[in-house]
Each structure stands twice: as structure tokens, then as C-alpha cells.
């Protein structure tokens, strides 16, 4: 049997496990829901082992490994923390942060839920289970991930017609395919182990070094180009896959257009580290990571959510990035990067630190402006609009190589688009 088919079968098994648990168990069946995490984790573990030993294409390994690991995180959120059920058609627990603990699950709701659960058909329950298993942003619902980009920035309530939606996304797929195919042969992959060597990851500590280990202007240019190129390719690949799935799902009447809001925000939103991660970059893993971080912050560490304390917000944010770091670390392992060499955890935790630094600087500037009692001049406004993107590029240029150089070292020029 084709190895890729076996890998996809493992992913389908994980999706089916989530669908069965969410669709056919009530919120009180917590033991059964917890037991469901065992086959999820078992599948992800064997997926990683299988990919490392049987799948040679690094692109396939990256996609399949990331999908399998993320389905474990999604299961923990949907089945255990948020406890989605068919009977309520919604999450029934606030442990994952989706709903206030006193706004749902009243006795009346539970009685109605029991009746609905008893009379529902097998296919309806299974369909609902798969709907949740395949969701990660919940657009057009009360539980949508914060700050999802609208279809039209000037008119956030606008939803395109089906024909316009299909035309736009089909065009995007074709453009991305052509761009990725055209850029796949650029550069010499034989140079990658040297150009992206681990000793070239440090930046500021090498600025004053005049010896062979020092950094040159040429290397800085290569570093900036590699980092920007990496994130541009990530953007293109993710948007391509998302648009392709959207075209298939809407064409076959599996879902409505309103469920496929853009996966990325506007590039103009990327004016700093916080806006890059919170508003521009895709939010596909946000709910799963936030759910686990919410539980740890407010139910294990016992921070008060209603206090609005800076410490609670920053602990929560750091944990969100840390969970994302775990996810990306295991995804790296599926690509053949040894666990100890993956820089994913360090990179993602650094993003939280970058946001804290950004917040602190903005607070100082705001306080100075208030104390001076003067508005922003034209020059200050121009500098303000430029400083955000410059700061973001500088931050990513410093922090990204610690993570992405590990995979770039191993890049042997295998095209992302194999045809």
C-alpha cells in the first residue's frame, strides 16, 4: 500500500475518533472523552515514527506530521475542555474559554438536549461530530476566533456570492501554483548546509566579531531574504491549501461561503509583533492552543480572569505560544529534525517576549505624549507608520533563524509542487 495513503488513514482515524466522541457522548461522559485522547496520542506518535522512516518527501512529511499533531490538540479542546456535544450544538464547558460558565447548560437546556440527543439520527450525530473535528476557527458562529479577517475590509458584513467566491479562490490557487512552481528551482540546495549552518543563527553576538565567525553585510542580506522568503512561502502554501479546500467544500455544497473567511488578514495589518500574530497571520491553531493555555492559566494556576491583571494576561499569552511551540516542535520531529535540535519552542516563546517589549515601548510613548499634551506631527505620524513594519522585520530576522534554519539546512531542493 502507498505510504502516503497509510499516513492519511491515520489522520482519518483521528478525525473519526473526534467525530464519534463529540457526536455520540454527552458532557457528563468525561471518562470516555478522556480515554479518547489515548488513540489520538497513539496515532500522532506512530504518524511521526512512520513519516520519519517511510516518507521521503519533506513537504508531505511537514504537512502530514503537523496535521496529526494538531488533531490531538484539537481533540483536547473540542472533546475535553470545551466539551462540544450534539445535544447542545455548542461547547458546554468554559474550561477552554469559549463560553461563560453560567450562560449555558441551564436545567431547561439540558432537558431539551436529552430529548434531541435521543431522537437524532446516527448520520446527524456523525455529521455534527465531523463538523467540529474539521473546525478550528468557527467562523460565523458565536465562538469564532477573535479578529478573523472579513471578506471585505471596507464592509466587514459583506459575504460574496458563491460564483464570485469560487472564481476568486480558483484564481488564487492557479496563481499560487504558478508562483511556487516558478520559484522551486531558485538557489543551489547543495549550499544550504553552509549558508544556514547552526553557527550562523546568532546575530547580535557576532556583530563585533572581526574574525571568520563574524557576520558580514552579505550574510545579513541573505538572512533577511531567507526569513522573508520563508514566511512568504508559508503564506502561499497555507493560503493555497485553504483556498483549494474552500473551492471543493463550497462546490460540493458541503459548507456555505460564510464559513470560509480569508485565512490571512491584510498585509497592512502586520505593523508589529502583536498584530502580526493576532491579526495578520492565520488563526488555524489559535483556538486549540488558547484552550489549553486558558485551562492552565485560570484553572490550574488559579489566576482570576475577571481581574484583568497584566500578569494573568501575559501568563496566558506566553502559554498560548508555548503550546504552539510544542505543536511545532513535534512537527519538526516528523520532518526528521531531532527533538533537541528543534528551535520551535524557543522561537514561539520569544514571540510572547517580543509582544511584551512592544507593549512596554508603546506604553512609554503614550505616557510621554499624554504628559506633553501635544498631538502627533506629520513627521511623527510617518515615522510611526514605518517603525512598526521595520520593528517586525527586525524581530523576525533575529528570532526566526533559530527555528527555520534547522529545516533549511536539510532542504535538498525538493519542489513544493511536484508537477
Curated annotation (Swiss-Prot):
InterPro entries: Wax_synthase (IPR044851), Wax_synthase_dom (IPR032805). Pfam families: MBOAT_2. Keywords: Acyltransferase, Glycoprotein, Membrane, Transferase, Transmembrane, Transmembrane helix. The chain crosses the membrane at residues 4-24, 62-82, 230-250, 314-334, 337-357, 386-406. GO terms for molecular function: O-acyltransferase activity. Residues 89-114 are annotated as: Disordered. Pathway: Secondary metabolite biosynthesis; terpenoid biosynthesis. One of its GO terms (biological process) is lipid metabolic process. Its EC number is 2.3.1.-. This is Acetyltransferase fsoF. It comes from Humicola fuscoatra. The gene is fsoF. Belongs to the wax synthase family. Glycans are attached at residues 2, 112, 169. Its main location: membrane. Fuscoatroside and some of its derivatives show interesting antifungal activity against Candida albicans and Aspergillus niger. It is a multi-pass membrane protein. It catalyses: 3-O-(beta-D-glucopyranosyl)-2alpha-hydroxyisomotiol + acetyl-CoA = 3-O-(beta-D-glucopyranosyl)-2alpha-acetoxyisomotiol + CoA; 2-deacetylfuscoatroside + acetyl-CoA = fuscoatroside + CoA.
